[in-house]
Design a protein with these regions (language model features):
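Acidic/histidine-rich catalytic neighborhood
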Residues: 494-545
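Catalytic cores of secreted or luminal carbohydrate-active enzymes
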Residues: 123, 127-146, 686-729, 733-734
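Well-ordered alpha-helical segments within folded domains of soluble proteins
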Residues: 391-402, 461-472, 530-541, 595-604, ...
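Extended amphipathic alpha-helical segments enriched in small hydrophobics
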Residues: 481, 485-499, 641-657
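Aromatic-residue-lined binding/catalytic grooves and analogous aromatic/hydrophobic interfacial grooves
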Residues: 6, 10-456, 473-475, 493-496, ...
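A glycine-rich phosphate-binding loop feature that marks nucleotide/adenosyl-phosphate handling sites
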Residues: 516, 559-564, 711-718
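C-terminal catalytic domain of Rieske-type non-heme iron oxygenases
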Residues: 374, 378-379, 511-513, 623-692, ...
């Protein structure tokens, strides 16, 4: 693009640039209201709550869920015991004996009976998950305005640079505008409806939960309710401000003769993340305080507060692959065109930044971590309980947090991990007679750390080891010694103690994990590869932490010996990396889980540089598994191929991840991306969005080997571009630009003094860094 004709015309140039920026603003937009929640409605959030707005013309629907509202848990029945099967460990030796004898069916039957978690069900259950529970929708706000005339110029949009949603349209000369946002500092949502001419509105709230009290006074609506199966108490409030007349009649708020009204929305529960009761929050008092703080603040004040807070995080990273080309199509139509082979680099950078938007909107300090759907859930019985799945999903949700410069957004996960340690110690003791703590696949807000109640999907004692990796990663990216000393390392050490006790020596002298089960694939086994790779990684991270903190020399020595005895990755008969110790991998198997490649990503045991034979075996395994799979599976494969430095293959998988799914007119694939850019497992799961974004970052920078590699897997399609603000292990912030596939500029800022080893296309440099200073690097 040439701007030469505007030289010497600063006003014209500034106007052009402003218009060009507006044209290329990062936003999703549509020319019709949403008809479907998961594929079309648009998400907003403040970390504590998530809401989806549909943009209906005569009737707006805003569905929302508060992050701590759950069924199940201690209040659901007197027998709730966090899924623990007391003295289950007594059956561990018999299961191991059967495995040693090769009696796998008998071992599976015994483990299924005695090493699975306990689930109680009753007729009062709101979900199919019994007293384990499920995340709950809080309810829906319906805002009705009766339009009898034809609407024109309709537009529904989500501006992810401001984290605000909009609906605009005209009826004749009357212009209508709606604005929606979630404010984290003030812990509220705000919805503003405006029109040139006065209108009448009716606002109603609907909840699937039992109503215990409802009131309206001085523009403040309160709905207090109870989750029927566990007695969890909650309250949601709407504070209405308007230039019209506000009243309450027959359970509905009426706003008459108004050119505008604003609904300030808060919601809280009595939940506290404190084992073993998980209750006691003064939710009514909290809401009262939240409403009181609105005094003297205008909508614009809260909007400004929100933007400053959000943009402080969002604007850390600027990712540019290209401008919009051709017609400015609605997002759903852009996605369809992209699926038919059209290059759309603007859409790709939008997807990356949309993932960051979702993380900022759903995971902030003091909130619960993201669940399978972030903070967005419209059901009392959601898929997989909308819980915290520890056999890939929960981890993938946070893969981009550090590299995408959102370290603060990982704090809820770190705090949640810490809350699992105490109940996880009970699980380790009762199921495995082991020290330390562990979790399996399914985890809820109520300390459920036991094996799941179904053995093939629920038995995964490596869950704590895997999730503990995030604690070490947070340290590596931030270099926060106090975090490592006071929070991360004590948790990591306890997770490692579990493996010190659980690993058993086999006839070859190797330490193996058994019984084990490669996540959701195969059968019970003696030594699933993923278990060994996770244990190796955990020990390795603990050893590094001991060295940083200069503590625990004896423990470091002990686990170094154990780490080096763990059964190593094995290459099988057709060149594959084996998923089990037995060479039984099927080259025609296309299973979605690729668990045995953990050591390649997100682990560090396998790399092209240090273990080329193992790396080649992972390539063979990936080729055999193919390029299909669920949404999150596709995202994981983007990361795998990036680690193998095959940017074009990673990009091929990335494009596959963005294939449309769930469209009314056609459904091209069984998994991919919905019209609102949510990832489709299906159904909607947020992990695919996050894994896809992490994979894009892996193409541009990698630092897992201790060397900061620049553009390690740049796809040919991304001929030119730039990215500013990505983070790397070691505490570095990176700005990169490239042209015609070659590095153009590189600058690095470090949080600490010391050497930084850099690698670009086989050329290595070492730069001496000074904390806070930026270094320009030439290759």
């Amino acid at each position: 693009m040439s701007l030469g004709y505007l030289k010497g015309q600063p006003k014209a140039l500034n106007t052009f640039l402003a218009e060009h920026k507006e044209e290329n603003a990062l936003r999703l937009w549509y020319d019709a209201p949403a008809k479907d929640w998961q594929s079309q409605a648009l998400p907003i959030g403040n970390g504590y709550m998530g809401a989806m707005f549909f943009g209906g013309i005569n009737k707006e629907q805003i569905q929302f869920s508060e992050g701590t509202l759950w069924s199940g848990g201690p209040g659901s029945n007197e027998d709730y015991n966090f899924g623990v099967r007391k003295d289950a460990w007594k059956h561990l030796a018999p299961v191991r004996k059967l495995l040693d004898e090769g009696k796998f069916e008998e071992a599976h039957a015994l483990a299924k009976k005695e090493l699975t978690g306990v689930l109680h069900k009753s007729e009062n259950d709101l979900s199919t998950f019994g007293d384990y529970g499920a995340q709950q929708t809080t309810g829906d706000i319906f805002i009705t305005v009766n339009h009898s005339e034809k609407v024109s110029n309709y537009k529904r949009s989500l501006d992810i640079e401001k984290a605000e949603g909009y609906v605009t349209y005209n009826i004749g000369d009357n212009h209508y505008k709606r604005t929606y946002f979630g404010n984290y500092p003030s812990k509220l949502m705000a919805y503003k409806f405006e029109s040139d001419q006065a209108e009448n509105y009716t606002i109603a709230f609907s909840s699937p939960h039992k109503k215990t009290k409802e009131s309206f006074k001085k523009g403040l609506y309160s709905y207090q309710g109870e989750v029927i199966d566990n007695g969890m108490q909650f309250e949601t409030c709407l504070k209405i401000a308007s230039d019209g007349k506000v009243s309450f009649d027959e359970g509905k708020i009426k706003v008459k003769n108004a050119k505008y009204f604003v609904a300030y929305h808060v919601a809280t529960t009595d939940y506290i993340n404190q084992y073993p009761t998980y209750t006691g929050n003064d939710f009514i008092g909290e809401n009262k305080q939240l409403i009181h703080q609105l005094k003297g603040k205008s909508f614009e004040d809260l909007q400004k507060e929100h933007r400053l807070d959000y943009q402080n995080l969002f604007e850390r990273v600027d990712f540019h692959l290209g401008y919009k080309e051709g017609e400015d199509l609605p997002t759903d139509r852009r996605l369809m065109a992209y699926s038919k082979g059209k290059n759309d680099f603007w859409l790709e950078q939008l997807y990356f930044q949309f993932s960051r938007y979702l993380m900022i909107s759903s995971s902030r300090p003091g909130t619960m971590p993201m669940h399978l759907q972030g903070k967005w859930n419209n059901s009392t019985n959601p898929a997989w309980a909308c819980d915290y799945h520890m056999n890939i999903n929960q981890q993938m949700l946070y893969w981009p947090a550090e590299v995408a410069n959102l370290s603060e957004c990982e704090e809820p996960l770190n705090d949640y991990i810490e809350s699992l340690v105490e109940p996880g110690k009970v699980t380790a003791k009762e199921f495995f007679n082991a020290r330390g703590w562990t979790v399996s696949t399914m985890n809820n807000p109520f300390g459920y750390t036991s094996s799941g109640w179904g053995f093939p999907w629920g038995f995964f004692p490596a869950g704590a080891g895997w999730i503990s990796q995030h604690l070490w990663e947070h340290y590596e990216f931030t270099q926060d010694d106090q975090f490592l000393k006071n929070q991360a390392y004590p948790i990591m050490k306890e997770a490692a103690l579990f493996w010190v006790d659980y690993l058993q020596e086999d006839e070859k002298g190797n330490l193996v994990s058994y019984p084990s089960y490669s996540p959701e694939h195969g059968g019970i086994s003696k030594g699933a590869s993923m278990d060994h790779q996770i244990a190796w990684d955990l020990f390795n991270n603990c050893i590094a932490a001991c060295e940083v903190l200069e503590i625990d020399a004896d423990f470091k020595k002990e686990i170094t010996t154990i780490r080096d005895k763990i059964a190593p990755p094995t290459i099988g008969s057709w060149g594959q990396l084996q998923e089990w110790m037995e060479d039984v991998d099927d080259p025609d198997n296309k299973h979605r889980h690729v668990s045995h490649l953990y050591a390649l990503h997100p682990g560090k045991q396998i790399s092209l540089e240090k273990t080329p034979e193992w790396a080649e075996a992972t390539r063979v395994s990936l080729n055999a598994r193919g390029d299909g799979g669920t949404g999150w599976s596709l995202a994981w494969k983007v990361n795998f191929w990036s680690r193998l430095k095959d940017g074009d293959r990673a990009y091929q998988l990335y494009r596959r991840l963005l294939q449309p799914i769930g469209f009314e007119d056609e459904s091209i694939h069984s998994s991919g991306t919905y019209a609102n850019l949510f990832c489709g497992h299906p159904p909607f799961q947020l992990d695919g969005n996050m894994g896809g974004a992490a994979g894009m970052a892996e193409m541009l920078i990698q630092s897992q080997t201790g060397t900061l590699e620049i553009l390690p897997a740049l796809p040919k399609a991304w001929k030119s571009g730039s990215v500013k603000g990505l983070k790397a292990r070691g505490g570095y912030v990176i700005d990169i630009s490239w042209k015609n596939g070659k590095l153009k500029t590189l600058s690095i800022t470090s949080v600490k003094n010391g050497p930084c080893t850099l690698l670009y296309k086989g050329k290595q440099q070492v730069k001496e860094m000074v904390a806070g200073e930026t270094v320009e690097v030439k290759f």
